[in-house]
UniProtKB/Swiss-Prot annotation:
GO CC annotation terms, alphabetical: plasma membrane
UniProt keyword annotation of Transmembrane helix present: yes
Keyword Cell membrane: yes
Family: Belongs to the UPF0761 family.
InterPro entries: UPF0761_bac (IPR023679), Virul_fac_BrkB (IPR017039)
Membrane topology, record value: Multi-pass membrane protein
Location within or outside the cell: Cell inner membrane
PANTHER family, per database record: INNER MEMBRANE PROTEIN YHJD, UPF0761 MEMBRANE PROTEIN YIHY
Protein name: UPF0761 membrane protein PST_2825
UniProtKB keywords: Cell inner membrane, Cell membrane, Membrane, Transmembrane, Transmembrane helix
Main location: membrane
TM ranges: 36-56, 93-113, 132-152, 167-187, 204-224, 238-258
Taxonomy of the source species: Bacteria, Pseudomonadati, Pseudomonadota, Gammaproteobacteria, Pseudomonadales
Length: 410
């Protein structure tokens, strides 16, 4: 029990370190700035898509009212009036103006994907058709699905099974928790679809639940602060709603990005969370897997390593394979896998060490045991190498500099 609690706190510290290393607060600030410009275009696109279908007439305004009542603190009433006025004016734009609004909405989606790719260590963003289809699906199908879901829930809520004398027990409670369930579904979809990498659905679901609960708690605390500490009105006066709304957007993005760190961290085994293996050991383990696959006539994918128990992060996989490719040790196949393209019988460990761009691991960084047949010999060799290095270069730097100066004077 104590070990599980320690692991939980250790994992939490790991997530906080990753969140700060990935510049989470800075990314949240950038997304807040982008959201400020994109919220009106997104609402305009949503209303335009829904108004194009007669069955969804008036649903857009109901969705907006529902969102502001359930997902934004009580200070959002003033902002809602502003946004409604801006949106009604935006509907009168020309085609050029509509194109600009669409570009602004796309810019927000690009910023979100960039932030998520940073968290997942994805170097190649979506390009071309795949990027266009994803964003078009969000901008076109998203409002339609929202409208269909809202219309369906409104119809169900009007049935006698819910509001009549024969109402089923528990259905009313289900209606009350519907905003939380919608938040879970939305965050799960975001974490599973936006990063340009494979995200296990169960991890995305865990992140969706965590983010939705944290989001709801933050909304309640934010509302309490606004209600009981109104000193901000003395500073901003009639404009107090605007900075509060910006602060809420910033906190929301902080929560979303931290949830993304959680989803990404769930894919790392405890060994990688606590102390990553030295790069040299990972390179040799990777070469062994590549060599075994070559003997079987198969290629190697990152998912193959994960199935074998080596939870190698994607960014480290890319770094090491990039180095191997530079040394002409591996080649990428047409299906995205990797194979050896050099005979390892004619490539020594000394060559690998001399070309290795990462420093050799110190003795304290080496694990006591590793399930690899070559590790005991390598560990002893590295210890002997470090001992010899200490004997040769153990003198003080001042002595070395003085000795070099004496040689120059001679």
């Amino acid at each position: 029990m104590h070990q599980r609690i320690d692991n939980t706190f250790e994992f939490g510290r790991f997530l906080v370190r990753r969140f700060m290393a990935d510049q989470g607060p800075q990314s949240a600030a950038a997304l807040t700035y982008t959201t400020l410009f994109a919220v009106v275009p997104m609402m305009t696109v949503t209303f335009a898509m829904l108004s194009a279908i007669p069955a969804f007439k008036g649903v857009g305004e109901q969705i907006q009212f529902y969102i502001f009542n359930n997902f934004i603190p009580s200070t959002g009433a003033t902002i809602q009036e502003y946004l409604l006025a801006f949106t009604s004016q935006a509907r009168q734009l020309t085609w050029f103006g509509v194109g600009f609004l669409m570009a602004t909405a796309l810019m927000m989606l690009l910023t979100i994907e960039k932030a998520f790719n940073t968290i997942w260590r994805v170097r190649q963003p979506r390009r071309g058709v795949s990027s266009f289809l994803l964003y078009w699906a969000i901008l076109s199908l998203g409002p339609l699905l929202l409208g269909a879901g809202f219309a369906t829930s409104t119809y169900i809520a009007s049935l006698s099974l819910i509001s009549g004398p024969y109402a089923l027990i528990g259905v009313g409670t289900l209606i009350k928790v519907m905003p939380l369930l919608l938040s879970v579904a939305a965050f799960t979809l975001i974490y599973a679809a936006v990063p340009n990498t494979r995200v296990p659905l169960r991890h995305a679901l865990v992140g969706g639940v965590f983010t939705a609960v944290l989001f709801e708690a933050a909304k309640q605390m934010f509302g309490v602060y606004v209600s009981y500490f109104p000193s901000y009105q003395l500073i901003y006066g009639a404009f107090a709603a605007v900075p509060l709304f910006l602060l809420w957007i910033y906190l929301s993005w902080m929560i979303v990005l931290f949830g993304a760190e959680l989803v990404c961290g769930l894919s790392s085994s405890q060994q990688w969370r606590r102390r990553p293996l030295p790069r040299l050991l990972v390179m040799l383990m990777l070469l062994r897997n590549l060599h075994e696959r070559q003997q079987e006539g198969r290629e190697l994918h990152l998912r193959d390593l994960h199935k074998a128990g080596l939870r190698l992060p994607e960014d480290e996989w890319d770094d090491i394979l990039g180095f191997f490719e530079q040394e002409q040790l591996v080649c990428r196949t047409g299906s995205g896998g990797w194979v050896l393209c050099r005979d390892l019988n004619h490539y020594s460990l000394d060559q690998l060490l001399r070309c290795n761009p990462w420093p050799l691991s110190a003795r304290v960084e080496l694990p006591e045991q590793l399930n690899e047949p070559w590790y005991p010999t390598l560990r002893r060799s590295l210890e002997l190498l470090q001992q010899e290095q200490a004997n040769l270069f153990g003198g003080s730097l001042a002595d070395w500099l003085q000795a070099n100066g004496d040689k120059k004077r001679q």
